[in-house]
Amino acid sequence: TLSLDYSEVLMAAAGTQAEAARAATMAKYPNGYIAVVEGSIPLADGGVYCTVGGRAFAEIVKEVCAGALGVIAVGSCAFDGGIPAARGGITGAVGVSGFIKDKKVINLSGCPMNPENLTATIVQYLTLKEFPATDELGRPLFAYGDSVHQRCESLPHFRKKEFVKEWGDAGHRAGWCLYQMGCKGPSTVANCSTIKFNGGTSWPVASGHGCVGCTTPRFWDTMVPFYVEGDPKVIEYLNKGLRSEL
């Protein structure tokens, strides 16, 4: 049985009623609930940059995760701090696994995270009583095992060296490869191209926009500029067999 007992976004309660619901859930199911954390955790200046009910978010996260049987970090901010942790940030933001050290954290990176991956992670636990196998960054292999490039619908165009040269050109309209327009699919692991978004409706490349590498650590710093062709060394790296054939 799955029961969503506390969610700031979805629950009708607010303020003290919402916080009371969280406390009641923790008391009713000690070491028997899954904590799903969204958003980065600011640590600078005593955690003042994010407070809930007058308490630092960091304090609440530590309290909730301490009594959880499992912790899932959803989205890039919860994964590694996201935009608040990018260069120039002052909040001291970190991801959940950078803050909670005494429990295994399942990281579902992405901006946005795909809800299908969250559902699959929880269903596997409910069914098998164990969380999915993960990579070295705590990301489930079923979702982050292959590069976006490997499963991309534009891969045949890449292999034929059919690249979009500018937005709106004939190649763009024909669905050619967006690598030269900045697509970071070769160096990004995610299952966006196979499960897509909005119930399988579409995903960025199918909409004519390249991958920005949002599942990658510190992507706001490491994947910019987004609209400049990827470093040729990435392709060289992949061609050496460190990933499967392009």
What positions do the PLM features span?
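Iron-sulfur-associated redox domains of electron-transfer enzymes in respiratory
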Residues: T1-S193, S202-P204, W220-P225
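The −1 position to Zn-ligating cysteines in a subset of zinc-ribbon hairpins
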Residues: G210
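Short Cys/His-rich local motifs and their 1-3 flanking residues in nucleic-acid-associated proteins
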Residues: T216
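Short cysteine/histidine-rich metal-coordination sites, predominantly Zn2+-binding motifs
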Residues: F197-P204, P225-I235
